[in-house]
Amino acid sequence: MSSAAHDNHGAGHGSLGSYAIGFVLSVILTAIPFYMVMDGGFSRHATILTMVVLGLVQVVVHLICFLHMNMSSEGRWNVMAFIFTVIVILLVVGLSLWIIFSADMLMMPMP
C-alpha cells in the first residue's frame, strides 16, 4: 500500500520579515533616484550613474528577498536557470542589435 505522506523538498518561502526588509529596501532604492531627478540640483552624470547603480542593487534585492534566489542546495538550480536565461536574453538582444546596425551600414545612401 502506498503512503499518503508527501515529502516536500522544494525551497522554503520567505518569512514576513524578509518580505518587509525587501519592501523597505525597494522603497529606499526607488526614493533616492526619484528625489535626485525631481530636485534637479544634481549633475546629469551623477543622476544617471546613481539611477543605474541603485537599479542594479534593487534587482539583486528583488532576486534575494522576493524570488528567494540563494546558493543553498534547493535554490542552486533556480540560480543556474536564471543565469542561463540572462545569457540567452543578452545573446538575443545583442545579436539582434548587431544585425540591425550591420544592415543599416550596408544600406545605400538616399539621394
Swiss-Prot record:
It is found in: Cell inner membrane. Its main location: membrane. Keywords: Cell inner membrane, Cell membrane, Electron transport, Membrane, Oxidoreductase, Transmembrane, Transmembrane helix, Transport. One of its GO terms (biological process) is electron transport coupled proton transport. One of its GO terms (cellular component) is cytochrome o ubiquinol oxidase complex. Residues 39-46, 102-111 are periplasmic. One of its GO terms (molecular function) is proton transmembrane transporter activity. The keyword Transit peptide does not apply. Residues 1-17, 68-80 are cytoplasmic. The chain crosses the membrane at residues 18-38, 47-67, 81-101. Belongs to the cytochrome c oxidase bacterial subunit 4 family. Heterooctamer of two A chains, two B chains, two C chains and two D chains. This is Cytochrome bo(3) ubiquinol oxidase subunit 4.
